[in-house]
């Protein structure tokens, strides 16, 4: 089926900042829309998100140039092309840009088109998007699918919230569920108990960028204790082996300066009872201690994005948890290979906009899975209502998804899409934490 037109235009993300939307038209009068997310704490290795730098138009944040690149440069090369030739078309996008970091046309331009081609391909193949991804792009024809375990961000800090918490995400992980819908039920019940606990302690229930609460709390210990309390109040067991677990995204590159790690936000207000400055060795001991004290099953970016040795040592000392690389890898095959050589992590966060095309994203996922590295499909803090990553998570069999809290419609949309897929697949959609957390 042929592409007959392509139109890019500017929309707003969940932070009210401009981003790219792409509408692709097929010869059967059907069309699809793809919307591109944007991050706040970004890794230095990420592909370039092209913005205009015009102080008089959206204060430097406009994406007019990326849109012009789609409409004027990319579009003519795609008209009348067969949308089912996905890898050929994606390779065309990569070659049109011709740079390693997508700096000519912009990763936000390429990704919008790449996602639109995948969505349109599913229509042309008369398949649900997740099935098209699995069969036609991953070449996996197993009749069963795996539901992603949700890592739900209930307390926001760092660059995602205007509070005194340096750690970016405090998440709950319902490993005790037997289905995705039950995992969402468990998460919702804990989320609302947390809301009650915050109110009873006269703490703010305002939300951060990803829909989690953003209260002023003294330190990480207090925050983790609060989450454990909320789990218990919802009548669940906080446990790494048979209950509800915790997960963290430290975003440590934001806390690293001149060879040391610092809790910057909390120490500036003198509210922390913790040490605030750490060498790499002290930082390893700090997180190892937290893991021993709380039911933490997963820690993401606990070291600066070039501190490969510390990642490797931490994983060696803590083999029974998931150590995740995000800024460490930036969904880039070259860096993932380095991480495998270092034995730096046992999991990778997958963000398509870090690399710029879906074909390259799939290459990273396939390579990770081949090397027994867990894959976690992730949103960005600046999101849209596009639910593509929900289908992607199921289509590639990622096993885990990070798409925020149980509030804010751009986050809920992804959860609701997976619930919809669960209704379609019924018992063919398997929720199996033991498959993806074998190291427990």
Curated annotation (Swiss-Prot):
Disulfide bond entries: none
Record's keyword terms, sorted: Cytoplasm, Glycolysis, Lyase, Magnesium, Metal-binding, Secreted
NCBIfam families in the cross-refs: eno
Names of the cofactor(s): Mg(2+)
Membrane-spanning intervals of the chain: none
MF annotations from Gene Ontology: magnesium ion binding; phosphopyruvate hydratase activity
Catalytic activity entry: (2R)-2-phosphoglycerate = phosphoenolpyruvate + H2O
Pfam families named in the record: Enolase_C (PF00113), Enolase_N (PF03952)
Record text on cofactor binding: Binds a second Mg(2+) ion via substrate during catalysis.
Enzyme class: lyase
Gene Ontology cellular-component terms listed: cell surface; extracellular region; phosphopyruvate hydratase complex
Top-rank lineage group of the source organism: Bacteria
EC number of the protein: 4.2.1.11
Subcellular localization(s) per the UniProt record: Cytoplasm; Secreted; Cell surface
Binding sites annotated in the UniProt record for (2R)-2-phosphoglycerate: 168, 351, 380-381, 402
Family: Belongs to the enolase family.
InterPro entries per record: Enolase (IPR000941), Enolase-like_C_sf (IPR036849), Enolase-like_N (IPR029017), Enolase_C (IPR020810), Enolase_CS (IPR020809), Enolase_N (IPR020811)
Binding positions for Mg(2+) per the UniProt entry: 249, 300, 326
Stated name of the protein: Enolase
Biological processes, Gene Ontology terms: glycolytic process
CDD domains referenced in this protein's UniProt entry, alphabetically: enolase
Record pathway: Carbohydrate degradation; glycolysis; pyruvate from D-glyceraldehyde 3-phosphate: step 4/5
Gene this chain is encoded by: eno
Active site: 210 (proton donor), 351 (proton acceptor)
